[in-house]
UniProtKB/Swiss-Prot annotation:
It is an enzyme of class 2 (transferase). GO terms for molecular function: N-acetyltransferase activity. This is N-acetyltransferase 8F1. The chain crosses the membrane at residues 53-73. Its EC number is 2.3.1.-. It is a single-pass membrane protein. It comes from Mus musculus (Mouse). GO terms for biological process: gastrulation with mouth forming second; negative regulation of cell adhesion. Residues 69-220 form the N-acetyltransferase domain. CDD domains: NAT_SF. The lineage of its organism: Eukaryota, Metazoa, Chordata, Craniata, Vertebrata. GO terms for cellular component: endoplasmic reticulum; Golgi apparatus; membrane; mitochondrial inner membrane. Its main location: membrane. The keyword Nucleotide-binding does not apply.
Length: 222
């Protein structure tokens, strides 16, 4: 196992942080495509439309072209929301990480470094409108480069956020993650997070059958 350490973000980390985050999010494009491909409505479309073309035109070539086009369209649909999400993040909080996190009271951004290179990231910001009587911290942007997974880095980064929250007297740490990110969900549940709810971020995600899961870690004294 290659050694690593966790430290606070520095401006010189920005390019590598963006790279880790972007690649981490775009890895979910293939799994989104596979999930959508196996939906009954998708299978019905892939079989029904080409078959209708064969019955109307008598051309199997046209049917094959239609299937290819539908698969290409499905791939583009699976790709677009992740690309838009990354673009939105890079134009908002991640355009200036120091301003968005390090200069905000009760917030922070950490990186995991190994061999002089950033291999993992995580961020946290206070929840703007928490429930009455609660002081909540939201965990964001957890991602570890594919070459450094399986070494406990994601768990260590999450522990860093939990310790920060404890030190800052937060009552809860909350986060949201896609149901597709089963590895992340398993990690959080194994660390004591509890499911607090779920919802669909948009009509697209509802049609795709992929919900956003809300998780919460409450400190015993809270």
């Amino acid at each position: 196992m290659v050694p690593y350490h966790i430290r606070q973000y520095q401006d010189s980390d920005h390019k590598r942080v963006v790279d880790v985050f972007t690649k981490g999010m775009e890895e979910y494009i293939p799994s989104t495509f596979r999930h959508m491909l196996m939906l009954p409505r998708t299978l019905l479309l892939l079989l029904g439309v080409p078959l209708a073309l064969v019955l109307v035109s008598g051309s199997w070539i046209l049917a094959v072209i239609c299937i290819f086009f539908l698969l290409l369209l499905l791939r583009l649909l699976a790709r677009q929301p992740w690309k838009e999400y990354v673009a939105k993040c890079l134009q908002t909080d991640m355009v200036d990480i120091t301003k968005s996190y390090l200069n905000v009271h009760g917030a922070c951004f950490w990186v995991a470094e190994s061999g002089g290179q950033v291999v993992g990231i995580v961020a946290a910001q206070p929840v703007k409108d928490p429930p009455l009587g609660r002081k909540q911290l939201q965990l964001f942007r957890l991602s570890v480069s594919s070459q450094h997974r399986g070494q406990g880095i994601a768990k260590a980064l999450t522990r860093t956020v939990l310790q920060f929250a404890r030190d800052q007297s937060y009552s809860d740490v909350v986060l949201e993650t896609s149901a597709l990110q089963q590895g992340a969900v398993t990690l959080y549940l194994g660390m004591g997070f509890k499911k607090a709810g779920q919802y669909f971020m948009s009509i697209f995600w509802r049609l795709a059958g992929i919900c956003t899961i809300q998780l919460k870690y409450s400190f015993p004294s809270a």
